[in-house]
Swiss-Prot record:
Disulphide-bonded residues: none
Binding site for GTP: 17-24, 95-99, 149-152
Protein name (Swiss-Prot/TrEMBL): Elongation factor G
Family per similarity comment: Belongs to the TRAFAC class translation factor GTPase superfamily. Classic translation factor GTPase family. EF-G/EF-2 subfamily.
Gene: fusA
PROSITE patterns named in the record: G_TR_1, G_TR_2
An example molecular function term from Gene Ontology annotations: GTPase activity
GO cellular component: cytoplasm
Amino acid sequence: MSENHKLSYVRNIGIGAHIDAGKTTTTERILYYTGVSYSIGEVHDGTTVMDYMKQERDRGITIQSAATTCHWIKKDDCAEQASQKEQEYKINIIDTPGHVDFTIEVGRALRVLDGMIAVFDGVAGVEPQSETVWRQADKYAVPRICFVNKMDRMGADFFRCVQMMKDRLGTKPLVIQLPIGIEDTFKGVIDLVKMKAIVWSNEDLGAKYEYHSIPNNMQAMVEDYRHQLLETVVEVDEEIFNSYVSNEDLSEEDIRKCIRKGAISGLFVPVLCGSAFKNKGVQTLLDAVVDYLPSPNDVNSIKAVDVKTEQEISRKVSVDEQFSALAFKVINDPFVGSLTFIRIYSGKLQTGSTVINTTKNQKERISRMLLMHANNRKDIKEAVAGDIVALTGLKSTTTGDTICSLDSQIILEKIEFPKPVIELAVEPKTPADQEKISAALVKLAAEDPSLVFTVDSETNQMVIKGMGELHLEIIIDRMKEEFKVEANVGAPRVAYRETITQSYTVDYTHKKQTGGAGQFARVKIIFEPLEAGAGFQFESKIVGGAIPKEFIPGVEKGLEEIKESGVVAGYPTIDFKATLIDGSFHEVDSSVLAFEIAAKNAFKEGITKAGPKLLGPIMKVEVISPNEYMGDIIGDLNSRSGVIQSMEPRGNTQIINAYVPLGQMFGYVSTLRSLSQGRAQYSMVFSHYEQVSRSIAEKIQAKDKK
C-alpha cells in the first residue's frame, strides 16, 4: 500500500465542548475501547490519562490540549478484515478545554485538525462555550460530528438539544441515531443507517454491544427520521439521488457515502447520542469518526506563501511533496525540556535531518521525534504527512511557526491568538525571586501565547495579562508548583482598549539639531476609525519620492509601537487606520529612526483630536437558576450594568442570557452562590468591546494619573 493510500486510514480529530459536557470522559472511553488504556480514567477521581497536569486533576477540568494516538477497527470489519493491517484506522486525538479562559487551546488545535467531535450535554444542550468552539470550527472550516452525551441523566432531552443546534449554532443537524429510553432507562440507540437497535451490556464496562430489531413502540418515529435522513443525504450525489427517486433500495454503503460527502463539505452535521460515563455509544461514535470525518487526503491542498516569490501557492497534502509542517504548541517537559508539537502537512520528516523555520529564517536540527500519549512518549524515527508529533530541542520555533525542507521554502497561514481581557500585578516575595519570576513567565508565555507579561519601565512593576481570572490563577499556581517561585498578587484589573470615533489629518515635522548629524522627518498621516474587530491597518500612498522607500517601514514601526499606549488612559488603541499621504526628508539628517519618532508624535497629536474613546470588554453571561431566585439574580445583573437579552424556561429552572461589562463581574461567583443558596450556576464568554460610560472612563483616567 502506498504512503498516500495509507493516509486515507488516518483521522486527525479534536474533541471540544462547553465545560462539564463530558469531553474528557468521552476521550477516556475512546482510549479504553481502542486498547490504549487498560482501565477507565475518571475525571471525578483524578485518574484521567488526558488531564495529567496537577492543576487539571485538582480542579477536574482540562487546561491544556492533550494529544494521543489510538487505533480502531470497525466492528463490521472485524470478521473479514481484522488480520489486514491496512483496515486499522489511526486516530490522532486532541482533547481540548471547555472553560472559556483556555479558548486558545481550542483554536490552535482546530487550526491543525481535519475534523472534530462536538460533545453536548444532553440536559443543558448548546451552552455558551459550545457556541464559541463552534464558531472557531467554522472559522477553520473543520467538518464535525455531534455527540449528545449524558443521555442517562435526569432531564436529558435529545430532541431539544438537536433543535438548539439549529437555533443557536445555525447549523443543519442530521440525526443518524435515536436514543432508546430516557434518563435512567436509557440503554442504547437506533442506528438509522443500519435500521437496527444497538444495546450495550452493563456487565463489562460497555465493551460488548448487540444488534436487535427496532422496538415496536419506536417504529413510527424511526421511519419518520429515516425518511428525513434519506431525503437530506441523497441531495449530495446525483447518481444515488436518481436511484432514490426511482424507488430503488439504497445500500448502507450508499447512505454512508452520502453522509460522508455532506459532512466533509459542511452541508450538514451528523448527530449521535450516548452516555460516555455509562459506557454507551462510544464505539459507534468511533465508527462515525472513520466513516464521516475527513482523512488528510480529503483536505486536498493547503494555502501557503512561497518564500522566494512571495506569491500565494497551494501545496498538495501528500507524502510525495516536499516537507512542510506547522508548530501549534510548545510545552516545557520536566524530563526532555522543550517539546514542540507539529502537524505535518506534506512530505516526510526524519530524525537527524535539518529543516528551516521560514517564519524566523532559522535552521533547526531534528534530534528527537516523539509520538505523544498525554504526558507519555514514544520515540520514532520518521513521520509523514498527516502525522501529529512532538519534537525536542528546537531553538527558535514557537507556536504558529512554519518549518519545512531547505529546498522548497514556504510559510503556512499563522494561528491567530485572542487578546487578553484581564490583568494582574505580580511582584516577587523576595528580591531574589525577581529573576526567577521573569524566567518562569518567559517559559509559560512560550507555551501559551494568550499570556502576555510586561514590566513598567518607570515603576518596574510586572503585569501579567490573560483570558480570565481562572487563567491567571493557574499561571500563578504553575509558577509555584513547576518553577518553585511565589509571588504577591494584586487585584484583577480589566484590560481596556482605546479607539477613535472620527477622522483627523496631522502634518508633523520632527527636527533635532545637536551638533553633527541631526534628525529630520516630516509625515502627513490620516487617522480614521474602522469597524469593530478590524484592528490596526497601515497604508502608504507616497508617490514621487516624497519619502524614500527605505524610511516608510520606520513610520509603520513607530505607529505599531506607540498604539500600545493610547492617549486616553494608556491602553492599546484598536480599530483604526493610518494612511501616510505625504512627507519630506533631508539628504543627510533623515533616517529610519527619525521617521519612527515623527510617526509616534503624529499619533499622539492626531489620535488626541480624532475623538478618542475608552472601550471595555463585554461578556456574554448565561445564568441557570431555580425559579425562586430569579428576581434577586436579575436585580443583581442590572446593578452590574447588565443588559438582559432573554429568559428561557427549562423545567423548574430559568436560563438568563445577558451582556455584562467584565469589570462588573469580578467576584460574581460568590455573589451568585449567596443569592441562590448555591443552587444557581453561570458561565461567561467574551463577546465584544464597547465604549465605557463617562463616569467609568473618568475613574480609570484618575487611577492612571496616580
